[in-house]
Amino acid sequence: MEGALDTNRKNAIEIKGLGKKYESFNDGESQYVLRDINIDVMENEFVCVLGPSGCGKSTLLNLISGYIKPSDGEIDIFGEKVTKASGRAGMVFQEHALMPWLTVKKNIMMGPKLHHKSKEECEKIAKKYIDMVGLGGIEDYYPRQLSGGMAQRVGIARALANEPKIILMDEPLGALDAMTRENMRRELLNIFQKTQITIFFITHSVQEAVYLADRVIVLKNAAVDCDVKIEMDRPRDMKSPDFAKYIE
């Protein structure tokens, strides 16, 4: 699996002059949590966003999804301005947020049902993504019966079942133990390769970002501090000298 991108691909996400400010509870003055953000994400590109807590990573994701509105600038998804939450991008959170009264299969079928797919289509879509994330055999389990890694796989399958062109991920592996997290990274890259989807991934781990991404964007003091292209083929060895250069 190569890390090179086709430069003829169009932009999936265009962020232009983006700013978000909130009114301070203390003095009533507005304070920017994001300022003058300019980012282009290509179709079928895996981009990781890094930064300390409170730097605006999750706010940026919520702006791209349309859950909140910007104070300045705009965001386009495949050339269309984001004005509200529309379902054009799938979302995966640190907490899987599965419906506890629904089985794995029925959680995954929720999106297709909302898009008025037939029962047969919903079943077919659910099976496709259950198999893709390696959950065959547990489709009738309930969320309480799943490990953290399994539950997060269901969350990813549920997002994919809507068949979006973009997946937005807010530290989806952050709550997992080290071994499960390592396995999930490999699974995620496998899904990325199979689906040719665009992934915009928030993390606080430098190693994780370098392992996964085509590009790593670092946020600091409410702005883009740097944008680094990872010029390494996949799969990547975290112990290699080339990998260490990016960590330094």
Segment roles from a protein language model:
Residues 50-52:
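The feature captures the beta-strand-to-loop junction immediately N-terminal to the Walker
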Residues 65:
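Helix-to-loop junction immediately C-terminal to a conserved catalytic motif
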Residues 102-110:
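Short coil-to-helix segment of the ABC ATPase nucleotide-binding domain corresponding to the Q-loop/switch region
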Residues 109, 120-137, 190:
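Conserved ABC ATPase "signature" region
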Residues 141-144, 162:
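Conserved signature/switch motifs of ABC ATPase nucleotide-binding domains
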Residues 156:
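Hydrophobic anchor residue at the start of the ABC signature
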Residues 167-170:
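Catalytic Walker B motif of ABC-type/P-loop ATPase nucleotide-binding domains
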